From Swiss-Prot:
Cofactor or coenzyme needed: Mg(2+)
Regions crossing the membrane: none
Subcellular location, record wording: Cytoplasm; Nucleus; Membrane, Caveola; Cell junction, Focal adhesion
SUPFAM superfamilies, per the entry: Protein kinase-like (PK-like)
The protein's name in its UniProt record: Mitogen-activated protein kinase 3
Biological process annotations from GO: animal organ morphogenesis; apoptotic process; Bergmann glial cell differentiation; BMP signaling pathway; cardiac neural crest cell development involved in heart development; cartilage development; caveolin-mediated endocytosis; cellular response to amino acid starvation
């Protein structure tokens, strides 16, 4: 769910926690836009933020931490795909610890599997997201540089855990009033495994088309961490111009947008496309010349454009890595390899989730959230 923990439009006027707040009567359930939020008595004073395909987000006052938080109500149990995405996000975020990745503060749900209809995920409240920010203003070069650095800093951690995010886009980058940025929405994340063609990988792959790397559309397997770098390149281009760089209307239109700017791929680049049908299609297209980045972004920093060029490289094997991007001259004022933490160990899913029925996924969600239940032993 895009921008899950983000409040719209800079969060203006949102009441902050104050002493003497009167909690709701125990047992009383607050309702937000017709949706009951069974999160009291710890969380009260709910205010609507937004909603996605399978849930709603509200802000609330946390009486324990004495601050406002975001609560995502998820009702996924009717659909296998929603269960899968919910479980994957919970599994990853409970194990990740990084300043530029949204964390989970608390999870509320019914005490029994049979009674569990919804899951409430409590996260830090972030006032806006990059999508909303770009709709409302043109960013300065300093802001672009700082946001890009934080995206890459978070992505370095994610990739060090051997995870692909697979759905990086402006609405999945949460921002607060002090310009701190956190990556959210890990529902499409996967273990990086270039040899494995995940069951249902392409059919289930619904990441926003505009930020998809060309190899996702051209190959049937073997994705690497470079797909996330492509998405970050698209985000950088959007920060420079306030508009998406490759706004394709459908699959082929998306490819045509990419080739219209990058030019026709070289023979060497074509050779890395496994899918012969896709390779033949590209070879059948009229030759296109690369458009100079400075022509597309005449007012932009030349170092930013050099980094953009290295991210938006057609051949994934030649695309810059996250570590190389962090060390690029454009980011030199922030670059500090001693303050860019990596995961303690690679992340592993105990099992491939794609083929599990929703009933089994519900059981796994119930187990995964048990540590937050009253009386549960302290989790890691």
């Amino acid at each position: 769910m895009a921008a899950a923990a983000a409040a719209p439009g800079g969060g203006g006027g949102e009441p902050r926690g104050t002493a003497g707040v009167v909690p709701v009567v125990p047992g009383e359930v607050e309702v937000v836009k017709g949706q009951p939020f069974d999160v009291g008595p710890r969380y009260t004073q709910l205010q609507y933020i937004g909603e996605g395909a399978y849930g709603m987000v509200s802000s609330a006052y946390d009486h324990v931490r004495k601050t406002r938080v975001a609560i995502k109500k998820i009702s996924p149990f009717e659909h296998q795909t929603y269960c899968q995405r919910t479980l994957r996000e919970i599994q990853i975020l409970l194990r990740f610890r990084h300043e530029n990745v949204i964390g989970i503060r608390d999870i509320l749900r019914a005490p029994t599997l049979e009674a569990m209809r919804d899951v409430y995920i409590v996260q830090d409240l972030m006032e806006t997201d990059l999508y909303k920010l770009l709709k409302s203003q043109q960013l300065s070069n300093d802001h672009i540089c700082y946001f890009l650095y934080q995206i890459l800093r978070g992505l370095k951690y994610i990739h060090s855990a051997n995870v692909l995010h697979r759905d990086l886009k402006p609405s999945n980058l949460l921002i607060n009033t002090t310009c701190d940025l956190k990556i959210c929405d890990f529902g499409l994340a996967r273990i990086a495994d270039p040899e494995h063609d995940h069951t249902g990988f392409l059919t289930e792959y619904v990441a926003t088309r505009w930020y998809r790397a060309p190899e996702i559309m051209l190959n049937s397997k073997g994705y690497t961490k470079s797909i996330d770098i492509w998405s970050v390149g698209c985000i950088l281009a959007e920060m420079l111009s306030n508009r998406p760089i490759f706004p394709g209307k459908h699959y082929l239109d998306q490819l045509n947008h990419i080739l219209g700017i990058l030019g026709s791929p070289s023979q060497e680049d074509l050779n890395c496309i496994i899918n012969m049908k896709a390779r033949n299609y590209l070879q059948s297209l009229p030759s296109k010349t690369k458009v100079a980045w400075a022509k597309l972004f005449p007012k932009s920093d030349s170092k930013a454009l050099d980094l953009l060029d290295r991210m938006l490289t057609f051949n994934p094997n030649k695309r810059i890595t996250v570590e190389e991007a962090l060390a690029h001259p454009y980011l030199e004022q922030y670059y500090d390899p001693t303050d860019e933490p990596v995961a303690e160990e690679p992340f592993t899913f105990d099992m491939e989730l794609d083929d599990l029925p929703k009933e089994r996924l519900k059981e796994l969600i119930f187990q995964e959230t048990a540590r937050f239940q009253p009386g549960a032993p302290e989790g890691p």
